[in-house]
Amino acid sequence: MSKVHNSEYIKELVVDNTSYKIYDINKAASDIGLPLKKLPYSLRVLLENVLRTNGNKENLLVFKEWLKTKKSNTEIDFMPARVLMQDFTGVPAIVDLAAMRDAMQKIGCNPLKINPLIPVDLVIDHSVSVDSYGNKESFDQNVHMEMKRNIERYQFLKWGQQAFNNFKVVPPGTGICHQVNLEFLSQVVWHNDGTAYPDSLVGTDSHTTMVNGLSVLGWGVGGIEAESAMLGQPITMIIPEVIGVKLIGKLAGMATATDLVLTITEILRRKKVVGKFVEFFGNGLRNLTISDRATISNMSPEYGATCGFFPIDQETLKYLEVTGREITQIKLVEKYAIEQNLWYNCEDTQEYTEVLELDLSTVYSSLAGPKRPQDRVNLNCVASNFQNELPYFALANKDIDKKYAVANQNYAIGNGDVVIAAITSCTNTSNPSVMIGAALLAKKALEHGLNVKPWVKTSLAPGSKVVTEYLKLSGLDKYLDALGFNLVGYGCTTCIGNSGSLNPEIENTINKNRLVVASVLSGNRNFEGRINPLTKASYLASPILVVAYALSGTLNIDLTNTPIGANIYLKDIWPSQKEIDEVIANSINSSMFIEKYADVFNGTKEWRDLQITTGTNYNWDKNSTYINNPPYFDNIGSEHSIKDIKSARILAIFGDSITTDHISPAGSISKNSPAAKYLIKHHIEPLDFNSYGSRRGNHEVMMRGTFANIRIKNEMCNGVEGGFTINQLSGVQQTIYDTAMDYKAHDIPLVIFAGKEYGSGSSRDWAAKGPGLLGIKAVIAESFERIHRSNLVGMGILPLTFTGKNTRLNLKLDGSEIIDLIGLSENIKPYNLVKCVIKKQTNEISTIDLILQIFTENEINYIKHGSIMQFVVESLKG
C-alpha cells in the first residue's frame, strides 16, 4: 500500500475570525471505508493522532480492521501533545535527561539534542508531609519543613527549568499535578503553529488518567517512556480493546461520586480490563459533572484500565467556563468537536469490545479496604468486614474487644480504631460536591455537640488553592478547622504515604500490643503499609465519610444504625444534595480559578530565592545523597544483542498483587535498612533520611530500597515480612540487596517469580530501574499490570508469563532452583515462546514454556539496547 501524504486531509476551521488547520478524520475515514460513528470516541482521538503525525494508509486501515473483531494485534505510533510529571517521578526523569546529555557528549555528539520537543509540565506535589496538623500554623510549618528537606532536589529542578526548553515547573505549595492539569493546564483542544488537534498526554504518574474525565486522552507511563516521548519518540502501542460502560439513571440517597468510582473499580477489576480502554456513555452522563467524571477517570489504574474516557459534551464546556478558560478556547473546543465527530451524540452507534451497564441509582454508600481499592464494602458492613479481615493480618493481636491505655492520655485504643482521618488526594478534593459535603457534615456535627476522637490524626490537603478559596467564601472552612481538619498542604500527603508520625504514645501502644489500627482517607490507594507503617488497615472513602469516621474514631460500629454521639446518628448530620448544590452555586465562580492560577509558576519567596548553577550540563556533586549520576550509560556504544539467560538464581518468589509500592517503596526509610546504612555512612542522621520517594534522584539509595517494603512477603522466607531472601551461595537469610550484590560479584544473573497482577499500583519506573540495577534479567509471573510491564521492558528486563496451568505454586519452587531461559538469542519476536529449564537441588530437571510479554518491534529494540534510554541516545547520535 502506497504512502499517502496526509496534507490532503488538511482543512480549514474558522472560530471567531481565527483560522486553524485541522486534520479531517471524517474524510480520512470515508476514504478507507471506515464508518467513523461506529468507532469509540477514544479511538477517534487516536485515529486523528495517527492521521496527523503519520499519514500512512496502512496505519489508518488498522482502525477499520479493529471494527471487525474489536481488537487488534497491529501496533501504531501515538504522539502525545504534551507530558505531565510530578516531582517523585520527575526528578529521576530529569536526572536521566542530564545523564543523557553527558552520554551524548561522551560519544562526541551535541548534548543539546537531549531536549524536550513537546511541552513538559512538572508539578511539585509529592514531597509535603503531614508533620504538623490540627492548627492554623500547620500549612506554613509543613511548607517550611518541605523546603528544608528538599532544597537540593528543588535546586536541581530549577536548574532543569533553565537548561531544557519546553520544561516548566509548578513550585511546591501550589496543588496536585492532576488537579492542576484538570483545572488549568488542559485545553481539550490544543493548538500549535496554527493547527488545532485534540489535547492528549502521557504522565509519569498512574493517575494521569484523571484528565480523561475532561475528554483529554491520556494515561500514565514510566519516567523512561515519558523521557523518550518528550524527545520525539512515539509511544508504540497496540490499538486496545475498548470496554463500553453504559451509565443510566442518577445517583440517589447518600451516594456520592466516590461511592460510584469504588463501585466501578470493583466491577471492572473483576472484569479484568488491564491494558484496555474503558469508555463511558449513556444517558447517565447528563447527571455527572466533570468533577464526578474526573473522580471516575482518576481511578482507572485501580480498576486496571489504561484510561476511563468520557467524550466531549455540554458538561465539558460548562467546566471550561467555570474554571476560567478563555471564551475563544471554549468556542474552539465546541466547534472542533462537532466538526470532527468528537462531540458526544447519544444516537451514535459506536461499537465496543464488550458493553457493561450500571444503573447509578443502585450505587450504595461505600468504603474500600482494608488493603486493596477494588475491595468495596457497603457502609453498613464495614465493621463486620474489618472483624473478618483481622485474623489475616500477620503478627497481629486478634482481640477485637480489648482496649489498651495510651500513656499520659485519658483514653485507650484497640483493634479497628481509626488513628488517621485524611481529606486528601486529587481523586476527591477536585470534586466540590464531596468537599462541600464534608464541610457541611462538620458544621452539623458541631451543632449537635459532636467532636473528633482525641486519638485521630486529622488533615486537609486539597489539590488546588481554589478549594480553600471556596470553603472560605462559603464560610464552611471554620467548621473543618474546629474539628482539626486544618489545611496541612497543597499536595498528595497521606494518599502517597506522607501521613507523618502519630503521637509517640499512640505509636508505642500500637507497637507494644500489636494492634491493627486504621486510616480512613479520601485517596485512591490503600495497599498494606502505604498510608502509614502503623496503620495496617486502610479504607478509602469520600471526604464526607472521612469526617464521619473521625467523629466515631473506630471501624467497629455500623454508622448506618449506631449513634455517633448521644442519640445522634450519621443520617442526622448528613447534608442533602440540595444543600450542597446551593453552596456550590453561591461559592464557586470562574474569577477564583483565574486569580489562583494567575501566578501558578511563581511559587513562594523561598522557592524564588533558591540559588542555582546554570549551564547545559549538570554539575554533579559526588557527595550528594539526593542527586547522583546514574550508571545507565556506562556501556554506551557497545554491541547490542539478546542472549539466552543461563544458570540464573531466583532472588525472590512473590504472591499475587505485588505492587510497585512493594517493589520500590515511596515512604519512610527504615533505620535498619540497607538504604539507611548507606545514608548513615554518608553522615545523614535518621531524622534527615526523608523518604524513598524524595531520594529517587540517587540510584545508590534506590537500589538499596528495592523490595525493601516492610510488608512485602518473599515466599522463600516463610513467615518473614520485609525485604529478605535466602542467599543460595551461603544458605543464609539476608536482605535482598545484600544477596543481589553477592550474586552480582559472582556474575550470576537473577530472576523473580510471582503470581497475578505483578507491578500493580503507581507508575514508578524505579520499580523497574531498581531490579535492573540489582541484576534481575527476567520476571516470571502469572500476569503483569500494564505500566509496570512497559517499565520492565524499558529497563531491559524480560517480562514472561506462564502458559497453561503452570504457576509458581504447582511448580513447587522453593528458591534453590537454577533457571535457564532458552530461545532469546535468535530472531526474537513479540509474544515468542521461551523455554524455561528448572534445575532442582535434587538434580530433577523440568522444562516449561513461557510467553514473552513484549508487544512491539520497538520494545524488542529497547531490550536489544539494554534500555529505552540507551536506544534513544543511540537514535539521536546521528
From Swiss-Prot:
SUPFAM superfamilies: Aconitase iron-sulfur domain, LeuD/IlvD-like. Keywords: 4Fe-4S, Iron, Iron-sulfur, Lyase, Metal-binding, RNA-binding, Tricarboxylic acid cycle. GO terms for molecular function: 2-methylisocitrate dehydratase activity; 4 iron, 4 sulfur cluster binding; aconitate hydratase activity; metal ion binding; mRNA 3'-UTR binding; mRNA binding. It catalyses: citrate = D-threo-isocitrate; (2S,3R)-3-hydroxybutane-1,2,3-tricarboxylate = 2-methyl-cis-aconitate + H2O. Pathway: Carbohydrate metabolism; tricarboxylic acid cycle; isocitrate from oxaloacetate: step 2/2; Organic acid metabolism; propanoate degradation. CDD domains: AcnA_IRP (cd01586), AcnA_IRP_Swivel (cd01580). It is an enzyme of class 4 (lyase). Its cofactor is [4Fe-4S] cluster. The keyword 4Fe-4S applies. Binds 1 [4Fe-4S] cluster per subunit. Pfam families: Aconitase, Aconitase_C. Gene3D superfamilies: 6.10.190.10, Aconitase, domain 3 (3.30.499.10), Aconitase, domain 4 (3.20.19.10). Its EC number is 4.2.1.3, 4.2.1.99. It comes from the Bacteria. GO terms for biological process: propionate metabolic process, methylcitrate cycle; tricarboxylic acid cycle. [4Fe-4S] cluster binds at C426, C492, C495. InterPro entries: AcnA_IRP_Swivel, Acnase/IPM_dHydase_lsu_aba_1/3, Acoase/IPM_deHydtase_lsu_aba, Aconitase/3IPM_dehydase_swvl, Aconitase/IRP2, Aconitase_4Fe-4S_BS, Aconitase_4Fe-4S_dom, AconitaseA/IPMdHydase_ssu_swvl. Monomer. Belongs to the aconitase/IPM isomerase family. Involved in the catabolism of short chain fatty acids (SCFA) via the tricarboxylic acid (TCA)(acetyl degradation route) and probably the 2-methylcitrate cycle I (propionate degradation route). Catalyzes the reversible isomerization of citrate to isocitrate via cis-aconitate. Could catalyze the hydration of 2-methyl-cis-aconitate to yield (2R,3S)-2-methylisocitrate. The apo form of AcnA functions as a RNA-binding regulatory protein. This is Aconitate hydratase A. The gene is acnA.
